[in-house]
């Protein structure tokens, strides 16, 4: 369709007209370009000219300008368009209403922060509570009693009511009073360090008992040849000796004398007489 339209006589006629127009324009512009630059009078008030934007001149006056002046005028008009756009943008921003400030009735007395509800304020006040100081308690014997340490930056369990259950001996925090009571019982019984003199004495006593028991077990592991043999380990088993050892409070038993012993006894009696 486009090729057919171009081949029509009307299209060729319009093409010829455009060529003629271009020739006329070239003839008209050629003396205008070769002409010397005209000197025009400048206004004596530069402040008024700088403040007021350049006005568009009529068509006849624009034809008197040189090409350089016409381009400079176009650049000035383009430069004046940017502030107008920014001014319109600033006006649109100023027209937008500011965000409505929310009324927060609940205010913290410490840091002056406001909250919409009392529950939020209570949760915030929990962060202002004083944390227990850093405490490191050790005992004399590190092998028997453990070391208890509390770091200030550590999060301690706090009950829902907000009450802190802290041990007065080792400053350890517990969520409930029952847990604190069970922990204090360990201090009173001497199972944990830091419970006073009684706890340390009981720990030292238990350490000495354990050392004696370990010594007895070590002696049982081997036989000392310097010690006399035990009765149950003797080679010649004598039932009479065993009976005397087992029952030292038994009465006297009659001696069974042989004939030779009786003769010797009679001789001894005769000699005494």
UniProtKB/Swiss-Prot annotation:
It is found in: Nucleus. Disruption phenotype: Delayed senescence and hypersensitivity to ABA during seed germination. Residues 33-64, 195-215 are annotated as: Disordered. One of its GO terms (molecular function) is transcription cis-regulatory region binding. A zinc finger (C2H2-type) spans 106-128, 165-187. Expressed in roots, radicles, cotyledons, hypocotyls, leaf veins, stems, sepals, petals, stamens, placenta, funiculi and maturated seeds. GO terms for biological process: abscisic acid-activated signaling pathway; embryo development ending in seed dormancy; hyperosmotic salinity response; negative regulation of DNA-templated transcription; response to abscisic acid; response to water deprivation. It comes from the Eukaryota. Residues 44-54, 201-213 have a biased composition (Low complexity). InterPro entries: AZF1/2/3-like (IPR044653), Znf_C2H2_sf (IPR036236), Znf_C2H2_type (IPR013087). Induction: By abscisic acid (ABA), ethylene, salt, cold, dehydration and the monovalent and divalent cations Li(+), Na(+), K(+), Cs(+), Ca(2+) and Mg(2+). One of its GO terms (cellular component) is nucleus. Residues 34-43 have a biased composition (Basic residues). Transcriptional repressor involved in the inhibition of plant growth under abiotic stress conditions. Can repress the expression of various genes, including osmotic stress and abscisic acid-repressive genes and auxin-inducible genes, by binding to their promoter regions in a DNA sequence-specific manner. Acts as a negative regulator of abscisic acid (ABA) signaling during seed germination. Probably involved in jasmonate (JA) early signaling response. This is Zinc finger protein AZF2.
């Amino acid at each position: 369709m486009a090729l057919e339209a171009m081949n029509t006589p009307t299209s060729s006629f319009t093409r010829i007209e455009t060529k003629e127009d271009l020739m006329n324009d070239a003839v008209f512009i050629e003396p205008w370009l070769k002409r010397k630059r005209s000197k025009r009078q400048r206004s004596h008030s530069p402040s008024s000219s700088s403040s007021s934007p350049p006005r568009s001149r009529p068509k006849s006056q624009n034809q008197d300008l040189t090409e350089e002046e016409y381009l400079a005028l176009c650049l000035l008009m383009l430069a004046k368009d940017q502030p107008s756009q920014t001014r319109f943008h600033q006006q649109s921003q100023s027209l937008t209403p500011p965000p409505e400030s929310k009324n927060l009735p609940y205010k913290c007395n410490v840091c002056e922060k406001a909250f919409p509800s009392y529950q939020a304020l209570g949760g915030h006040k929990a962060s202002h509570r004083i944390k227990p100081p850093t405490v490191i308690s050790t005992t004399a014997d590190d092998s028997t009693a453990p070391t208890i340490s509390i770091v200030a930056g550590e999060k301690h369990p706090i009950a829902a009511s907000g009450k802190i259950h802290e041990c007065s001996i080792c400053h350890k925090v517990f969520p409930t009073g029952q847990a604190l009571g069970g922990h204090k019982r360990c201090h009173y019984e001497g199972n944990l360090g830091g419970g006073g003199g009684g706890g340390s004495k009981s720990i030292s006593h238990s350490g000495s008992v354990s050392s004696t028991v370990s010594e007895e077990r070590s002696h049982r592991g081997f036989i000392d040849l310097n010690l006399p043999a035990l009765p149950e380990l003797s080679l010649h088993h004598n039932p009479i000796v065993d009976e005397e050892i087992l029952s030292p409070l038994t009465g006297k038993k009659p001696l069974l004398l042989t004939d030779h012993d009786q003769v010797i006894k009679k001789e001894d009696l005769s000699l005494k007489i």
